[in-house]
Structure formats: C-alpha cells, structure tokens
C-alpha cells in the first residue's frame, strides 16, 4: 500500500467554516507528517483510532503516523473552529483527544467512522456531524471579517484595522485570542506565509519586481521585504528553508502532496475589493459599536 494524501473542498454548506477536508493513507512504514501553522484548527480521525484536535499552531508540529493507517481530516478557517468548551488560546500548539472536548459524542462518532464502508463514507459522517453542530452554534462575525482583511494581498497595520472595524486594538486582540487562538499580528504573519505557499502550489509566475529568482519574486508579491525576510519566517514557522520545504520545486511541497484544494479558496481572496471598501461595508452593517 503506497502513502497517499488527497484533499478536496468541503461540503458547500461548510465552506464558510472549513478550508479543506482530506483522506490520508500511510504505507508499510510509519510516515512522518510535519504540520504547519495555517491560522486554523484541525480535526484528525484515524479510522479505528482516537480522534484528535490539533490546536492553532505557531510553529511546526511533527507527528509520526503508524503504518497502514487511514485518516480523514478537516482543516478550519481562522476563527471558525467547531464548537468547543474553551477559548482557543488555551489550545495553542496543543494536540488533544477530541473526547476531552466533545465528550461522548466524539466517541460515538469514532465508532461510526470505524464501522463505515470506507474513508469516503467516514468523511461524510464527519462533515454531517459538523454541519449539525454549526447550525446550533454562533460565530464572531467581526473576527471572521478581520481574518479576511488580514490576508496578505492587502496588507494593513493592526491599529488601522481595529479603527476600521470600530473597536480598540486591545479588543481586537482579545477577540482574536479567544476565537482564533493567536493575536492579529501573529495571524497576519501566518496568513502571509500561507499566501506564499498558495502561490508556489499554484505555480504562480512572480512579478519579478526584485531579482530574477522565483522565490524572491513570490516573496515580494505576497508582502515580504525580500527573500531573506521570507527565509527567516519560513524557518520560524516550519523549521525548514523555503527550498527544503518545497523540495526544490516551485509547484509542490517537499512531501509531494497536492494542496490545491486547500489553497484554492485562499487564492480567491486576491480578487476581493480593497480594504477600505471591505471595512466600510462591514462597519455600515453594524449599527452599534462592538465591544
């Protein structure tokens, strides 16, 4: 059995909360998986095993997946975690058994997944459970909008962002910590790096505004000062250099996995209106000052 990893878009009803879902199979030997910060949390459901939640990451998290394991997973957008009994800043860089957070419902879901006809059915069971949970749970629309406005394609200073959302910087930070797990500046840095990975995965052609090197061009396109700035951030977030992470290729990660489904909605935000228009629309929609 060969190792495989296949991403896809979530159910349309979950697209506002879930960035991607996937099915992963390991081969005859254990597989070393390097999880990177994405700004969101993840749920991992090894079929026949114990489901886990991976909290918001601020650096690389290395996991050894046992041989002959089949796993289905869900990656959430920033600020759009599934209903949990705690704030997300308590879960930063943590890996927890889902039963600790969801109680018996996690165990029942794990049993249903273990008895599923296959991983496709197991993934449907997970998405169905999430859909039921999100229908009865609320989200913080301000933080969701802040996360969109922190995308690298329209860089903004955090103080200006708070002003445009009609709250103080301390309020913005507190609400981000509770619902994203990290402050807005950390989220902005994470999303900028995700933007670089998205461009690399898509095989984007750099603008060439600085230097002839492809990495340097993409670095500037996504908001880094130069390639050295990108390299420092890549080492901090992944523990690897950009070239090592990409495996020497500009259109895939070093592990060979195709993450197009994960980055497709991310790249779509490049066509959003300028920040000034977005913030004005959001503030006009809020009749009172949020606290």
Specify the residue positions occupied by each region the protein language model found.
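DNA major-groove recognition helix of helix-turn-helix
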Residues: 176, 188, 234, 246
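Alpha-helical bundle regulatory/interaction domains
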Residues: 1-169, 179-184, 198-225, 241-291
């Amino acid at each position: 059995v060969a190792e495989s990893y296949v991403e896809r878009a979530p159910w349309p009803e979950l697209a506002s909360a879930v960035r991607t879902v996937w099915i992963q199979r390991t081969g005859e030997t254990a597989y070393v998986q390097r999880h990177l910060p994405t700004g969101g949390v993840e749920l991992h459901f090894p079929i026949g095993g114990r489901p886990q939640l991976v909290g918001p990451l601020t650096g690389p998290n290395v996991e050894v997946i046992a041989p002959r394991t089949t796993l289905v997973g869900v990656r959430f957008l920033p600020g759009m975690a599934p209903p949990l009994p705690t704030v997300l800043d308590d879960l930063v860089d943590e890996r927890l058994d889902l039963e600790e957070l969801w109680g018996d419902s996690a165990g029942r879901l794990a049993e249903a997944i273990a008895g599923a006809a296959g991983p496709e059915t197991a993934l449907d069971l997970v998405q169905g459970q999430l859909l039921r949970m999100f229908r009865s749970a609320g989200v913080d629309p301000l933080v969701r909008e802040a996360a969109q406005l922190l995308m690298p394609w329209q860089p903004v200073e955090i103080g200006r962002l708070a002003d445009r959302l009609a709250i103080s910087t301390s309020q913005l930070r507190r609400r981000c910590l509770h619902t994203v797990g990290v402050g807005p500046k950390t989220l902005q840095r994470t999303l900028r790096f995700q933007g670089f990975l998205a461009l690399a995965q898509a095989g984007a052609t750099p603008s060439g505004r600085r230097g002839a090197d492809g990495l340097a061009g993409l670095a500037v396109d996504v908001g880094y000062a130069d390639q050295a700035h990108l390299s420092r951030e890549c080492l901090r977030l992944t523990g690897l250099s950009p070239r090592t992470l990409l495996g020497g290729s500009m259109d895939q990660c070093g592990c060979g996995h195709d993450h197009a489904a994960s980055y497709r909605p991310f790249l779509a935000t490049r066509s959003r209106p300028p920040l000034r228009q977005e913030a004005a629309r959001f503030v006009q929609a809020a009749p009172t000052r949020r606290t």
